[in-house]
Amino acid sequence: MHFFLYLCRQFIIVDSMRKFILIIITLVALNAISIAATIVHIANPETWTYSELRQYVGQTIQFDVPFYVCNNYNGLTISPRRIFQPTNQALPLSAEYNSILSLNSQGTISLTNAGSNRRLGERLHNLTVKVNSNTSVSFISCDWQGNTRADLERGLDMDAINMRGEHSLLVCCMNLEYYLVESLGTGYGPDNYSDHQKQRAKVSKALAKINADLYGFVEIEQGQSALAEIASDLSKNTGKHFTYIDDGGSAHSSYTKSGFVYCSDVLEPYGKLRENNTGVQNRKKTQAFIEKETGEKFLFSVNHFKAKSGKGSGDNADKGDGQGTFNGDRVREARSLLSHYESDRSYFADEDILIMGDLNAYAMEDPITVLREGGMIDLHRAFHADSSYSYVYHGYAGYLDHALCNSTLYPFVTGMVAYHINSDESDSYTYDKSNDQTMFRSSDHDPVLVGLKLGEEVVENEDITTNSYEVYFNKEIPSIINAEGGHYYVYRIDGNLIKEAPITTEREAIEGLTQGIYILNIYGNGKCVQTKLLVP
């Protein structure tokens, strides 16, 4: 202030006020230029690497595309794309696998000064940062958008269970991350009764919010107490009547199993529980259910395959192909699942089957390939192409939690979705690290939901006359050929649906797509064809 008054006096004395004002304005303008962010253009977020930051070290910049939170452990890691497990999108050791692996290794940067309690997948629009190095930037400002808790509380994620019409039956499968009632303090799951009550509160709120008619659980305590407790909580919280399938077992330390809880107002079990004890026991079970309103029957198979961790030998050794250890055992479990299905459908006198559970294998790994080649349809890929995930490990998204069905049940599937209340959340919200009593981070895996309309085919566009769908480009605009009467969905590679419409012409143009990579789903004749679009 004294310096300013001194300048004023000097310029007044020499009668040069206009010159003084000009100098002040010039100084202000120069200062504004010095703090303005350089706008950095990212041509293709799918191939962007942190090396592109090197030229901006020491500068303040603003990105012209949104960034995504990819990791929220001990700070934030961000990228202009969601980072996926390579084997969730490509066959192990294939050329595409190696390409994804290479891009993943240099596609993220560390964001300092922005905290850790952000959900994975949150978008940072107009992100302004100070570039510390080509791998680290300091947060200045952004507009946070998308993938919020409020969105999930409104049930927006669950809309996908009705992609092909309104469901009449909702099925949910969830890994409960060691839900224990009797065997507390074993080193797995809750250490004491207080921890159990906190875990129970979070899980019960999640299940009540989902409000399914049929639940399959993995990583739930052996015996009947845990299932009985969940059934009781569901009955209390929903006003409906829930019960469970008693498998006759008893609790044994922290060992877990697969189990079933169902709404007896809507469903009744048919026949006796069938167990498949190939590999890890008590974790692969099938039960048939009849929908009371329609009298329709289907088989529900809940499974938990051998984990990827530990030391293995022979075909169980880690081969460095992204599939981890015990892949051989998981392949054998997948084959046994198919062979048991043959006897199960004879016993239950029905062939419609829905297979769900934590198979500890990503979408393109060998066990899932076995199931697909055995005639099972991957519902994640059928409805969401490459964008689906239910689990995030060290910032890498993918789905270990599967939903598959055979071709006779598929026409009655209205949709499916992984409900992202867990995998995107910070680990600091778990029951043993906080007093958070919300449904968020009730487990480390997302629940997977499947909508059914039994007795009424919901497959759209049965009047499509050919399966020879083609996609071609005319002046950089993609068009679909030979799918008139069908329906298409376009997703960004991060999983966001950006465009969907009926196919009303023989050559349907998909307009309005900017440069980038997209996933295109074309529906018709009870099938879904997926392809990647590279818009130049």
Language model features: what each stretch is:
Residues 292, 296, 302-327:
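Active-site His/acidic residue clusters
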Residues 2, 462-536:
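C-terminal outer-membrane/trafficking sorting elements
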Residues 38-47, 56-58, 63, 113-136, ...:
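Metal-dependent phosphoester-hydrolase catalytic domains
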Residues 221, 226-306:
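Structured beta-strand-rich core segments of catalytic domains in phosphoester-bond hydrolases
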Residues 168-184, 271-273, 297-307:
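Active-site-proximal beta-strand elements of phosphoester/diester hydrolases
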Residues 36-186, 194-201, 236:
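Extended non-catalytic accessory segments flanking core domains
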Residues 20-30:
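Sec-dependent N-terminal signal peptides
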Residues 94-96, 134-237, 241, 246-256, ...:
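N-terminal, active-site-proximal structural segment of metallo-dependent hydrolase catalytic domains
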